[in-house]
A protein has these predicted regions:
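Cell-envelope and extracellular/periplasmic
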Residues: 21-196
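Bacterial Sec-dependent N-terminal signal peptides
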Residues: 1-23
């Protein structure tokens, strides 16, 4: 029984390391990318994958004198937390390793602000193109670079997924008309009320 459990554990570790990962020492899920928003005044979890036993370091430009360090575990995963200050930006987040200086990820145009999940039934995904009051006027005036979307496409799976196919997008008229109208107006209201 112990041998079976060890074999399963090793197989899971191998799967985690090789499942869609590149041969670079560190790799991030899509949720951590350029234009992302991190929750302000919080401690935010950041995670990814890499070569086992590699030290991963993070430096956010909002706390330039603090370096956060963690290690990649035997299954090829790493996770750490980074503190955030009040709303602002744009910032950068550098993620790098000691043993391979050439492997440095720099995420750009990061905002610290409010992060909300907008989810629900089919009416939640209706875009302004499905018909809203003053549709064209709202679309034409949808230049809000501090409102960001991270929209997931519909994908089925029989097991939990560790990554997704999506990217952060700044709110422009072109982007706004394709995204959730409810999410857009909610984000716009938050921006007006909270000044973020």
């Amino acid at each position: 029984m112990k041998r079976t459990i060890k074999t399963i554990f090793l197989a899971l570790c191998y799967s985690a390391v090789t499942n869609g990962q590149t041969s670079t020492p560190i790799h991030l899920p899509a949720i951590f990318s350029d234009h992302m928003v991190l929750q302000q005044k919080s401690t935010v979890s950041i995670w990814g994958w890499g070569e086992a036993s590699t030290t991963v370091k993070l430096v956010g430009s909002w706390i330039p004198n603090d370096t956060i360090s963690t290690s990649v575990d035997d299954c090829g995963r790493w996770r750490t937390k980074i503190p955030t200050c009040g709303h602002g930006g744009p910032y950068t987040l550098q993620i790098f390793t000691d043993n391979r200086k050439e492997n440095k990820i720099i995420l750009k145009d990061i905002l610290l602000g409010e992060v909300w999940l907008c989810s629900g039934q089919s009416n939640m995904e209706w875009s302004p193109n499905n018909g809203i009051h003053n549709r064209q006027e709202e679309i034409d005036n949808a230049n809000h670079p501090h409102i960001r979307f991270f929209s997931l496409s519909k994908q089925g799976s029989k097991s939990p997924q560790e990554d997704c196919y999506a990217q952060w997008e700044q709110c422009t008229p072109e982007i706004m008309q394709k995204r959730s109208a409810i999410a857009y107006f909610f984000g716009k209201r938050l921006q007006q009320k909270l000044n973020v």
